[in-house]
From Swiss-Prot:
It comes from the Bacteria. It comes from Prochlorococcus marinus (strain MIT 9215). This is Aspartate--tRNA(Asp/Asn) ligase. The gene is aspS. One of its GO terms (biological process) is aspartyl-tRNA aminoacylation. It is found in: Cytoplasm. SUPFAM superfamilies: Class II aaRS and biotin synthetases, GAD domain-like, Nucleic acid-binding proteins. Its EC number is 6.1.1.23. The record marks 30 as: Important for tRNA non-discrimination. InterPro entries: Aa-tRNA-synt_II, aa-tRNA-synth_II, aa-tRNA-synth_II/BPL/LPL, Asp-tRNA-ligase_1, Asp-tRNA-ligase_1_N, Asp/Asn-tRNA-synth_IIb, AspRS_core, GAD-like_sf.
Length: 598
């Protein structure tokens, strides 16, 4: 049907007969000549039709609506000098049409303009409902091509190092991994269910037990969790696993992979090794294990200075084992008013939404500290000197303080730090600040359920477990550091991994630590325990979020911009109206009865 696409055309094609196919992006009638911007997947070309080309052809061109699918044949000409479009690669050319065929008419009015000339801020819900039209706008297609390039570069890199791509099952066993599973009823086993995998974690470990040595997969994963801009119920991981490797070898190898992706996609070189930071240092200084290191405002611990000054909120926090922490906003006295950090203010609200009761503040004015009387009246000169030394605050700076539960203080000041950095334009958006976060605790305590939860997952190997006695081992495990690592970029987690447990006894003890009984372990993970007893090699790996990597590389705000047909924030596909009801006969086949609570 066609012998060229738009972007292939150049000055060497002048005078040649070409066939092109595409959409009418825009039609204009100037002085009896019809100009049509023809759009295909590669770009644009102006085509011209005038009455001298034939009455029928001209009449047909007059009726063309935007987005009509056409095929045209004609001669490539050089545009007149005064009509050259320097914004297009084909802006010096035009096609003088000899023949035009309509391949498909527009039946209905379009729900939104597709032409880049008419591009408007279309609501995302409408874009998702008519995703095929949104794709035609070009930007999404470019995003998908970038995604494809990332996958292509990754495959080539891993193939060159002897990795084997293996597909693991999508219908698998429901196991407790953190988020809710998507369940699939098994018709041939009434009352039983498959689960869609939250990750290929256990299967890739079993591949290592099977001797594969080096594995990767572009893996579809599914998690039934609350959504946000960087989450979808189904998402894609670049999943990697290796045998007989150390933590250092895994980090070094995967750092090279990430550098290769950035080089091939953005032509950016990173010559130095990515910096590293322990989990504890990240929490102490940033309040999060995903720190954005492009700007300062580090958290500072003021518990030793302010815990005993007699201010009730501070006293209670320290007595309860909590924190008093601060961030310093340089020049904050002039850029942030009291209204914004008091109840009803936007910064106060950010802290409150993160669980804090509020914010205290201190303004540095010369050698004096300005704050509420209950704090200021109890500050000695020594207190003031210590505060200024720890916070590194100078004249004109604003110190914001949080006090209370450790987790809430860290979380609220982290959110406030991010909010202020964006608000005051403190972030250098040209920077790519990669960071390896290492030495995660194996577990965190769930006080509500009176048990431990794995910070990553219960298949991470703990460091320095020496005891073989079950009771002593259990105590060591509870307080251990994991052989785990995350790669963070500009405050977002790109991927995470660990060395895995390859000894059956240790794996059983770790699963007991998260609250499983021996019976539950055998029911849920018996196949894994049995495999580890049959000569499992030391192994480890990592999984990168492909959607998130693509989002960062294209500069998008949501991973929905990297996926051809994403779900909305209610986990619905607006294009197909999924999920939807199914017929009674389908439910009957599965012996499923639906009851809905009023």
């Amino acid at each position: 049907m066609r012998n060229k696409i738009c972007k292939e055309l150049n000055n060497t094609d002048i005078g040649k007969l070409v066939n092109l196919c595409g959409w009418v992006d825009r039609r204009r009638d100037h002085g009896g000549v019809i100009f049509i911007d023809l759009r295909d997947h590669s770009g644009f070309l102006q085509i011209t039709i005038n009455p001298d080309d034939g009455a029928d052809l001209f009449k047909q061109a007059e009726t063309l609506r935007n987005e009509t699918v056409i095929m045209v044949s004609g001669i490539i000409n050089e545009r007149p000098k005064d009509s050259i479009n320097t914004n297009l690669s084909t802006g010096e050319l035009e096609l003088k049409v000899k023949d035009l065929q309509v391949l498909n008419q527009i039946k209905n009015n379009l729900p939104f303009p597709v032409s880049i000339h008419d591009y408007e801020n279309t609501k995302e819900e409408l874009r998702l409902k008519y995703r095929y039209l949104d794709l035609r706008r070009g930007k999404l297609l470019e995003n998908l091509k970038t995604r494809h390039k990332i996958i292509k570069v990754s495959r080539e890199f891993l193939d060159n190092f002897g990795f084997t791509e293996v597909e693991t099952p999508l219908l698998t066993k429901s196991t407790p991994e953190g988020a809710r599973d998507f369940l699939v009823p098994a018709r041939l086993s009434n009352g039983e269910f498959f689960a869609l995998p939250q990750s290929p974690q256990l299967f890739k470990q079993l591949l290592m037990v099977g001797g594969l040595d080096k594995y990767y997969q572009i893996a579809k994963c599914f998690r039934d969790e609350d959504l946000r801009a960087d989450r979808q119920p189904e998402f894609t991981q670049l999943d990697i696993e290796m045998s007989f490797v150390s933590e250092e070898e895994i980090i070094s190898f995967n750092e090279s992979l990430i550098k290769k992706i950035w080089k091939e996609v953005l032509n950016i070189n990173f010559n130095n090794a990515f910096p590293r930071m322990s989990w504890q240092a990240a929490m102490d200084n940033y309040g999060t294990d995903r720190p954005d290191t492009r700007y300062e405002m580090l958290l500072k611990d003021l518990g030793g200075v302010l815990g005993d000054i007699g201010f009730n909120i501070f006293t209670k926090a320290i007595k309860a084992g909590g924190y008093i922490k601060s961030i310093t906003v340089k020049g904050g006295n002039s850029s942030i008013s009291n209204v914004r950090i008091k109840p009803g203010g936007d910064i106060f609200q950010v802290a409150q939404d993160a669980g804090a009761g509020g914010l205290a503040f201190i303004r540095v004015k010369g050698d004096e500290l300005e704050t509420i009387g209950a704090i200021k009246n109890n500050l000695s000169e020594e207190h003031i000197a210590d505060i200024l030394k720890i916070t590194e605050a100078k004249d004109g700076d604003l110190i914001l303080l949080g006090a209370g539960d450790k987790q809430i203080v860290n979380q609220s000041l982290d959110r406030v730090r991010q909010y202020i950095a964006k608000d005051l334009n403190l972030i250098d958006k040209s920077k790519w600040n990669f960071l390896w976060v290492t030495d995660f605790p194996m577990f965190e305590r769930n006080e509500d359920e009176n048990r431990y939860e794995a910070l990553h997952h219960p298949f991470c190997s703990p460091k320095n477990i020496k005891s073989k006695d079950s009771d002593k081992m259990q105590k060591e495990i509870e307080n251990s550091i994991a052989n785990a690592y995350d790669l963070v970029l500009n405050g977002m987690e790109l991927g995470g991994g660990s060395l895995r447990i390859h000894e059956a006894n240790l794996q059983r003890e770790v699963l007991k630590t998260v609250g499983l009984t021996d019976k539950e372990i055998d029911e849920k993970f018996g196949f894994l325990i049995e495999a580890l007893e049959m000569g499992a090699p030391p192994h480890g790996g990592i999984a990168f979020g492909l959607d998130r990597i693509t989002m960062l590389l294209i500069g998008a705000d949501s991973i929905r911009e990297t996926i051809a047909f994403p779900k909305n924030q209610q986990a619905k596909c607006l294009l197909t109206n999924a999920p939807s009801n199914v017929s009674e006969s389908q439910l009957k086949e599965l012996d499923i009865e639906i009851t809905i609570d009023e």
